Each structure stands twice: as C-alpha cells, then as structure tokens.
Amino acid sequence: MSEKLIPFFLECGGLPPLCYLRYLAIQSVRVIVTTAVIKRRQVAALQSFPYHPNMTRTWKIRDGALTIGERTLVMGILNVTPDSFSDGGQFFSLEKAIDQGKRMFDEGADIIDVGGESTRPGNAGPVSAAEETERVVPVVEALSKALAIPLSIDTTKSEVAKAAIDAGAAIVNDVSALRFDFYVADATAQAGAGLILMHSRGTPATMHRLPPVADIMHEVTTSLSASIKMAERRGVKRETIVIDPGIGFGKSQEQNLELIENLDQLRTIFPDLPILVGTSRKSFIGRILADEAGNPAPPDRRMYGSMASLAAAVMKGANIVRVHDVRAAVETVRIIDAIRTNSQNPA
C-alpha cells in the first residue's frame, strides 16, 4: 500500500475503495489546477512578445537598431556571384551591383543583403575567403556610403564577415548558423553587429541529397537553440540575434510548406527573437507551379508564388522577408500589415 494512501484510509475508517476514490479526485483537481496555471503562464509569456504590428521591440545592429513589429521589414538580395540559382552573373560587376543596390533602396528595401558565394543546392564547392572578400567588400564599401539603410553580409566565413563589417556592414547573415565557422560569432560580437542564424542541413553541395528528417519542426528548433547558445557563449548579445528556419535548405517540398504553415510554433518557442523568412524564387515554388508536362517554373516565373508564400509567412509571424523582387514584396507586406493592424484595432 502506498504511504500516501494510509492517512486517507485512517480518515475513512478503513474503507479503502471510498478512500481511494477520494484520493483520485483530489489528485485530478491538482492536475487540472496545475495545468491551468502552466497555461496561464504560457499565455502571459506569449503576450509579452507578440508579433502583431502594434507591438514593437528592437533589433540591435552595428551602430544602430531596427524596429521589429511595427511593420514587416524587407531585405533585398544582392548576389555578386557568377553562379547563384536565380540571378547569378547579373550583378557580378561592381558597377552593376551598385546600381542594383540603389534600385532596391529606391523600391523600398529596409536592408540589403550582399552575398559573394552561391548557396544553391548542388553547388560545386566553396569559394575561398580571399575570393569572397574580393567580391563583396567593394560593394559593401560603396553602398554603405551611398545608402541610408543597413547592409548585411551573407557569409559563413569569419574572415569575410570581419572584412565586410570593417567596410560598413551592420549585420551578418550566416546560413550555417555557426556550423561552418563559429568564429563568425566572435566577429559579430566584437563589432556589435546583428546576427542572423539560419537553419540548414549538410552543405550546399550535399543538402539536396540528404534523407528527410522525421520531424522538421523539432529539427529546426533544436538546431537553432544550439546555435543561439553557442553565439551567446561567444559574446553575442541576444538582442542582436534574428532566426531563420531556412526554407529550401535541406528540406523537402512538404517540409518547406510545413515550416511556413507552423511558423507560429517557432514564435512560441523563441518569443523574444525576430524571425526572418526567405522563400524568394525557391525551387519548391517552381515545382508547385510546374506546367502540365511537369516542368518546374524557372526562377524568373516564380515572383507571384514567392509573394504568396511570403504573405503566408508574415501572417504566421515572420518579421523580415528576404526577397529578390523588392517592389513587389514591399507592396505585398504593406497590405498584409494593414490587414493585421486593422484586426488588432477594429473600428
């Protein structure tokens, strides 16, 4: 007999069945009360970090900050590479890259993300740090002087990150979330720059061959948690961190859609961190928009699908969207933000 039951049996004059029922009833009430308390605490935590437009918080970046939550921010993609999946070679020259950066600024970009190495699935191999630096630093240097918006450097290499920060970048966007080079965190912390940690699996050369994981939400949240802890251990302040679930990086089409659909779960787990989502022109959009013969839509015919997917992501809690088509994205999120603001402040 359990020692916990003896006092109940003595109280009831030695009638075990009745005492046992009383014991079960008391335990059930305790469980219900405890569950209610936990749920109230969870709701309170979520209410402390909502993502609807009329509540804001600050993302600290180098020499400044960006307001998160007031409206959705748009990050324009500027690839200075010969082989990116969507626009490789278009802006490889310094003059064309600068012109494109200015064009995105005029179209309403809040941030411009400069990348010097293609991360498309199946990419042949990494670019050396020296070559990548040579590609991005002149562009960052020129645009930081010409534009009044922050620049981000899209790199997984600490050497490139440091050089770009010295040239004027305020944010580091690491698609490996420190898996390839954890010294990226050191370079970011020392400069007080913003740090975007994106979930990915494998490398650009192998990610498309990896077997799918059973639970993609668990995989993403667990991996990002580990990267966040590593960044903080190396001196990165939490208020400088943004997370990205990594749509299209080592995921199946179904998993990409699942991540977008369940983005609010990521918000629940990381309520204080801004979320960036990049679906722009990704291959899963091309496959969904395939023609009758099954041929995927090419990158230049994926804009409308990209806008639909980013709209869904914003409605689920994305704070920043990373896009090729800046004007279309700016207009799309403006409408979404208006709808959400209206729903929070009905007439």
Language-model-detected regions and their locations in the chain:
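Short, positively charged and aromatic/hydrophobic N-terminal segments
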Residues: Y23, I32-T34, Q42, P50-Y51
